[in-house]
Amino acid sequence: MHSQKRVVVLGSGVIGLSSALILARKGYSVHILARDLPEDVSSQTFASPWAGANWTPFMTLTDGPRQAKWEESTFKKWVELVPTGHAMWLKGTRRFAQNEDGLLGHWYKDITPNYRPLPSSECPPGAIGVTYDTLSVHAPKYCQYLARELQKLGATFERRTVTSLEQAFDGADLVVNATGLGAKSIAGIDDQAAEPIRGQTVLVKSPCKRCTMDSSDPASPAYIIPRPGGEVICGGTYGVGDWDLSVNPETVQRILKHCLRLDPTISSDGTIEGIEVLRHNVGLRPARRGGPRVEAERIVLPLDRTKSPLSLGRGSARAAKEKEVTLVHAYGFSSAGYQQSWGAAEDVAQLVDEAFQRYHGAARESKL
C-alpha cells in the first residue's frame, strides 16, 4: 500500500481521472486539482465533455505502437464495463479514400469482433472500407462514473486554477500533469507544442446503433457516434490551431446533410427536418505536435530561483531550500483521449511507481 504517498493529479479530464483511479486502487492518496471538474458538462474550456468517446483507432502499428497498446488495453476495459451500462457495443463502419492507409496496418482486426473489409457496393465510388464491432461511452457520464469510483476510494477533488507547478506541488510527493491544453501556459510546463484542434458536432436523439467514420471525401469528413442513452454525436470538423468556440451555422448544415446520407436512421422521416437536434457543440481537442507526452521528469523547485530571496544567500543555503521533485506528464492525446485513456493511465501508474522506488534525488527522465 502507498497510503502515506500523496499524489496530486492536475486535471480532471478522462486522462487525469483514469490515471487517478488506477493510482487510488494501488493505494496512493490521490487529490485531483482542476479548474474544471466532471460535473462541468457545459464548460468549453474543458475538452472531455464534448468528445464522441468511441473506440476507433487511427494509428498503424508502425506509426504508433505505444498508442496501439493503450487502445488495446482501453478496449478490453470497456468490454468489461458493458454489463454496467457505462459502455455499449456498436457496429462500426469506416470508409477511406484510396490514397489513405485504407486496409493497411489495421492491427485491431485481431481485437475487434466481426472485422471484415467492405464490398465496393457499400462504399462511395473509389473508396474502400471495413466494418467491425466497436464500443462507445457517454463522455460526460463516463467521467462522472470515474469520479464516483475515485470518491469511494477516498480520493478528493479541489476546484482551482493552477498557473504554476509550484502550486500543484504544495503538499504533494508527486504530481501527474494531465492538463491537456493547460500544458501550454502553466509555468514549469510551458509546452508550446500543445495546440487545439477545434471540433464542431451536433448532438441528436436517435436509436441509431451504427458508428460510422467516413473520410472517403477528404474535403468533407463526417462521423456518426451513438452513445449510451439514445444520443448520437454527428460531426465534424478538425481545425488545427483553431481556438474559435462559436457555432458555425453553415458547418451545422454540412454535418447534418452528410450524416443523413451516411445513415438515414438518425432522422425520424429521412429528412434533415426529421433530425431531433439536442445541442450544438464546439470543443477543443487537446493535441500536441509530436504526439502524446507520457513520461516522468525530475524538476527543481522553486522554478525561478534567480528571483527567490534565497538567491541572495550562500549557495549552501539555497541548496537546502531547493527540492527536486517528480512530475509525470500525461497530455496531448487529441481526439484519441478516450480510446487511449485506460492504457495510458496504466503507463502513468507505472511511472509513478518507478518514481517512488527509484528517484532518490538524482535528476533523470523516464519515458515509456
Swiss-Prot record:
Changing D242V: Increases activity on D-arginine. Optimum temperature is 50 degrees Celsius. Optimum pH is 8-10. It comes from the Eukaryota. Residues 308-321 are annotated as: Required for dimerization. GO terms for biological process: D-amino acid catabolic process; D-amino acid metabolic process; nitrogen utilization. Anthranilate 2 binds at F58, Y238. It is found in: Peroxisome matrix. Homodimer. This is D-amino-acid oxidase.
